[in-house]
A protein has these predicted regions:
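Hydrophobic alpha-helical segments typical of transmembrane helices
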Residues: 47, 84-87, 100, 109, ...
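A transmembrane-helix-recognition feature enriched in membrane-embedded lipid enzymes
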Residues: 2-60, 112-113
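Glycine-rich helix-loop-beta junction characteristic of Rossmann-like nucleotide cofactor-binding loops
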Residues: 63-68
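Non-catalytic C-terminal accessory region of glycerolipid acyltransferases
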Residues: 3, 131-245
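Short gly/ser/thr-rich secondary-structure transition/capping motifs
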Residues: 54-62, 129-130, 189-192
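Catalytic core of membrane glycerolipid acyltransferases/transacylases, capturing the structured
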Residues: 23-34, 38-41, 54, 69-126
């Protein structure tokens, strides 16, 4: 069984890379100019959907209410699987970008995006972190949604989450845009964070997209911590309810 899990993990990752390199000319074209970002989002969605299909994954999204993705927002989610990022590309639309660790600049696939559209952050450098924060704030103010994982890294103890960092919530408050919480319910069961060693299994990925939270009420002193705690509890409650089903 362990061998089959590892074989499936290798197969899925190969499909991700294969589809990416076939589509590379389109990705290269779409990442050259800012006004092509919506087109890039559609390309990412197609890429991820096809890779999922070839990797024997299905997906089911449940939305608490209809979401207008034409308006900028900060989208935050729990992070415990390599499936999280491609899955969120399937479930959203519009003009968006990611913020992620600087190591992704060396990733054979993702470096194209982090050298152009997405924003890398070096958490070991206060100056680099500040510059990255200002960059994404400017992008959001110009109408581009931001996607990031407030845990800061992948949780290896899912369904337990790591403590949230405040960056995502500060950006949302400072830019006067809503926070959109997203809960990945079972990705860690299909492909855990240590998937390189534990492997993966096919299945249906389940996602709950919560209603947006207006950040206008969190500008007062203590509002940042209050917002972070509230979003953590919203995502965690849904995650734990599913885990204890």
């Amino acid at each position: 069984m362990k061998i089959l899990r590892k074989l499936h993990f290798v197969w899925y990752m190969f499909m991700v890379a294969l589809v990416f390199f076939i589509m590379y000319p389109l990705f290269y074209y779409a990442t050259r100019k800012r006004e092509r970002n919506v087109f890039l989002g559609e390309l990412r969605k197609f890429w991820c959907k096809l890779a999922f299909k070839l990797g024997f994954y299905g997906h089911h999204f449940e939305y608490e209410q209809p979401i207008d993705f034409s308006k900028p927002m900060v989208i935050v989610a729990n992070h415990s699987s390599y499936l999280d990022t491609p899955l969120i590309c399937v479930g959203i639309a519009g003009d968006y970008h990611f913020m992620g660790k600087v190591e992704l600049l060396k990733h054979p696939v993702l470096k194209l995006f982090f050298q152009t559209v997405d924003v890398p952050v070096d958490r070991d450098s206060k100056i680099a972190s500040y510059r990255a924060l200002k960059k994404v704030e400017q992008n959001v103010k110009e109408g581009q949604s931001l996607i990031l994982y407030p845990e800061g890294t992948m949780s290896l103890i899912a369904p337990e989450m790591l403590e949230f960092k405040s960056g995502a919530f500060k950006i949302a408050i400072d830019c006067d845009v809503p926070i959109l919480p997203v809960t990945f319910l079972n990705n860690y069961e299909l492909m855990p964070g240590n998937g390189k060693t534990a492997g993966s299994v096919p299945g249906v990925m389940k996602v709950f997209v919560h209603k947006p939270i207006d950040t206008a009420a969190y500008k007062e002193e203590g509002g940042l911590e209050k917002l972070s705690t509230e979003v953590f509890n919203i995502i965690n409650q849904k995650l734990q309810n599913y885990a204890n089903r």
